């Protein structure tokens, strides 16, 4: 039996800005994403897809999406399927226009607004992408229409192990400022939806700019760090929201014969391999 695992890479919160602009005058998010893409292309075995879990750009501007597209094109050119979803810094229309034909950014229904869809990956594993964007608001939520579509996507393959992706974390983390803008509207309904579908093995998200591990219903929830800047780790109840120049990173989700769904943290940078033991 071939024991080669299947890999899904999760990048998150690249916050691409207008060319030449730095976040907080310090962070070159384009250079950070370029490095992440270079590292993804070096991963072996070759990933079966790349998920980017929201806050793709910083202000939802078409010029930012144009730069994001350019930065992600090496993945497209390498034949890696892209799965994109919006975060609170994104705008659906410009995102869909920039990536039409290059990535899954809509399910294709005429007049659809929410970016929700499923990809069946080898292994097998079903990736269900959900849209928690509430335009003009930092927190996330699901309305009845999106919850109904999520239910339909999960009901299509109840027999297939499933990973659900959204931008906003569906539970508190102890980061008070971020918890105030987590998934809010429809949270109880989303938890009930996950509970009703035992095939959901993992829920993954972004937004936090940190790796965290939690749970909703029976499923583990893991958040990805940003490919650029991180949110400072301060668990005091009155801690302000602050950014930190901690190491960037991404997640690699692995599964396959004899291997349950396992999530690994990869850190940005060139790390010396000191010995083969």
Report each predicted region and the residues it spans:
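Active-site environment of divalent metal-dependent phosphoester hydrolases
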Residues: 16-20, 58-61, 84, 88-96, ...
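His/Asp/Glu-enriched short active-site or ligand-binding loop at hydrolase and phosphoryl-transfer sites
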Residues: 224-235
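Active-site-proximal beta-strand elements of phosphoester/diester hydrolases
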Residues: 5-18, 124-134, 163-165, 219-225, ...
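Active-site neighborhood of phospho(di)ester-bond hydrolases with catalytic His/Asp-centered motifs
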Residues: 10-12, 49-54, 81-87, 131, ...
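N-terminal active-site segment of His-dependent metallophosphoesterases
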Residues: 1-67, 114, 173-176
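Extended active-site neighborhood of metal-dependent phosphoesterases/phosphodiesterases
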Residues: 62-156, 186-190, 195-199, 217, ...
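Active-site-proximal segments of metal-dependent phosphoesterases and phosphodiesterases across multiple
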Residues: 22, 141, 157-204, 208, ...
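A short C-terminal boundary segment appended to hydrolase-like catalytic domains
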Residues: 250-277
């Amino acid at each position: 039996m071939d024991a080669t695992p299947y890999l899904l890479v999760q990048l998150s919160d690249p916050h691409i800005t207008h060319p030449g602009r730095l976040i907080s005058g310090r962070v070159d998010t384009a250079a950070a994403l370029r490095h992440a893409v270079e590292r993804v292309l070096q991963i072996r075995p070759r990933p079966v897809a790349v998920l980017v879990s929201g806050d793709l750009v910083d202000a939802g501007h078409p010029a930012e999406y144009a730069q994001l597209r350019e930065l992600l094109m090496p993945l497209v050119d390498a034949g890696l399927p892209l799965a994109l979803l919006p975060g609170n810094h994104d705008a659906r229309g410009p995102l869909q226009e920039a990536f039409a034909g290059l990535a899954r950014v809509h399910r294709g229904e005429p007049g659809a607004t929410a970016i929700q869809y499923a990809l069946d990956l080898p292994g097998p594993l079903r990736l269900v992408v959900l849209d928690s964007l509430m335009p003009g608001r930092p927190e996330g939520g699901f309305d009845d229409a999106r919850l109904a579509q999520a239910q339909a996507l999960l009901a299509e393959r109840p027999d297939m192990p499933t990973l659900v992706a959204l931008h906003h974390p569906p539970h508190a983390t102890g980061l008070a400022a971020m918890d105030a803008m987590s998934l809010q509207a429809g949270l109880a309904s989303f938890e009930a939806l996950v509970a009703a579908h035992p095939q959901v093995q993992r829920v993954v998200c972004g937004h936090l700019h940190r790796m965290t591990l939690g749970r909703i219903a029976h499923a583990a929830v893991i958040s990805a760090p940003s490919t650029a800047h991180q949110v400072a780790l301060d668990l005091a109840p009155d801690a302000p929201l602050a950014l930190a120049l901690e190491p960037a990173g991404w997640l690699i989700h692995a599964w396959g014969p004899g291997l349950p769904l396992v999530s690994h943290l990869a850190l940005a940078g060139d790390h010396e391999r000191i010995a083969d033991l």
